């Protein structure tokens, strides 16, 4: 633990007097919290210093130019930086250059009143309600029981929540399950539709565009959504390639990743895979820190986290919050939800917001918890964690009829009495939003998209409006770079999970072997013709059933995709194309494997040309089948829902393909299903490839009696029957006379709509269509906002 905290640049590692008195190790412990002294910041944890800004001209400076100037300054250039520079002192003593205003940066009240802050996130009267349905209300015939209580039509998840978060501090949202913690984090992170959320969220007093917020912020979900087969370093490097501008050299991106690995305490695990249930990887705490690192790779100005310590032991949770404290002190606004912080974690938090049934029941620094509850008539006992006491009391008050309301009213009265109406805990913004972004760039914040030159920051123009959505580039990299990075990442994942391809190849080879041995060397008799029909129907449908394993591929990546695209890491079109490129080589291998196993063994016609056409139609079938499964994976949300849909739909496709019933016999009201059947076109294609030659004869002379009651007659009798037929019809029909050619058989099967090449291209077109539909499903179904 001490080695981990020692690496963090924002903490002086000399033990505090309390640590020395109690003989505690140098573990970053911020002191035991006692009654009326629950929050005592580390004495050597220094605030950010604001040096006097250099003179600037009244001209707009792009973020790209600011970033370039910062890089020049770091490399020793004399280029001036036209924004305030914030520095962090690492020593134990306070340097003389730190202004007296900084001394109160971590005062008990959370900061001195009126002290200018670079960034202040303020939220006022946030209210959010959702429709509430009774269980089973979707059934039209269900009526509520007489004794069933009437439920309100709307359920309020947030009820007039107000507060503010500042750079350099951590604001923690606490409450029991269902109190509205995650909902509030989503509201602040712009993950709730504007038409559903009431109230205002501003930064430095200015409303912010959603596209700009995506650029300067990051959101860390409660779940660890990572690729299990990538190492820690690879995961962060891919995040850097997605979030950092392409004008930044690769060596600088690698340097940023190395620094972040050190900051997160992941140096020993850098070359370890993330892991999952079947592959051993990093620990739970390390995985959580990697999740945070992925979203802070571009050093965001604002960081929102949904229960980052959930599921971790106390040591791992403390390490995670310590990292967040370092991020906050680097000049970021950090807002997180947390269930129940320990003593040590509480010492790292600057501001608490307790929720109960969507209402604010306490808002302020940890140091004010004891007097707050003392004034409420519920003093916190000595040596008890104040947050545990508060959460237990809030839970107890929720069982009372007006308990939550009384506590919320007490909080409102407390705020009015101690902080005044409309008066926060200090930290008034000392600059406009544009100036704040400019200052963040000068501190080394690599704002995503900053080098596109599309978003300008007028550091000296106080009257200029904040950047609009039209001036903010949505994506850092161009389309082809995104596709290249996504393709490379997918190939690495595929290479490290060879068992997935091996299982598919084994399934194809086993199926081909079984078909080859059953339909070995078919002859050109009527019986051989019927056996060919069965082989083609089973073979073509096998292609589609084999592709059903593509369904869980995207479903396993679904939430990773949602996390990455929520902040415009890449375009959805880039993902679809890279997904297609990575999957295509395996389809080629599977097609050749199946064709080599069956074509010559069954004795199909066409020679070399026929073989390569057979390979092409098998490949087209794999292409269309994988596209169909991919499309469904974008529509359904769970693999247990997807497989029944895939299997049942493919069964219908086979039923209407023309094998079981000819097109001429299908009822007219079902004929449309025949034409959308994916099996129809490859089935008819291989049939025409086999029976399209008019010189091949499949029924000669007495063979016409095969598969009829006359088949059991002696050969001599069959010959006499042929002679009688010849005399009656006036046509000479001998034992060698060709009765049915290949084209004749195709007409009998009603395979006359399309030629074999048309069937091939239609099958290929189905594959493209399903991938386009997959892209549309990602556009419509991958929204990251609540309604």
Swiss-Prot record:
SMART domains noted in UniProt: AAA
Residues bound to ATP: 175-182
UniProt biased composition (Basic and acidic residues): 1-17
A cellular-component GO term for this protein: suberin network
Polar residues: compositionally biased ranges: 74-85
Family annotation (Pfam families): ABC2_membrane (PF01061), ABC2_membrane_7 (PF19055), ABC_tran (PF00005)
GO BP annotations listed: cellular response to hypoxia; cellular response to salt stress; positive regulation of response to salt stress; potassium ion homeostasis; regulation of secondary shoot formation; response to abscisic acid; response to auxin; response to gibberellin
Highest taxon, organism lineage: Eukaryota
UniProt entry tagged with the keyword DNA-binding: no
Transmembrane segments: 500-520, 535-555, 576-596, 599-619, 620-640, 641-661, 728-745, 760-780
Keyword check for Transport: yes
Stretch list, region Disordered: 1-25, 71-116
Molecular function terms, GO-annotated: ABC-type transporter activity; ATP binding; ATP hydrolysis activity
Recorded family membership: Belongs to the ABC transporter superfamily. ABCG family. Eye pigment precursor importer (TC 3.A.1.204) subfamily.
Protein name (Swiss-Prot/TrEMBL): ABC transporter G family member 5
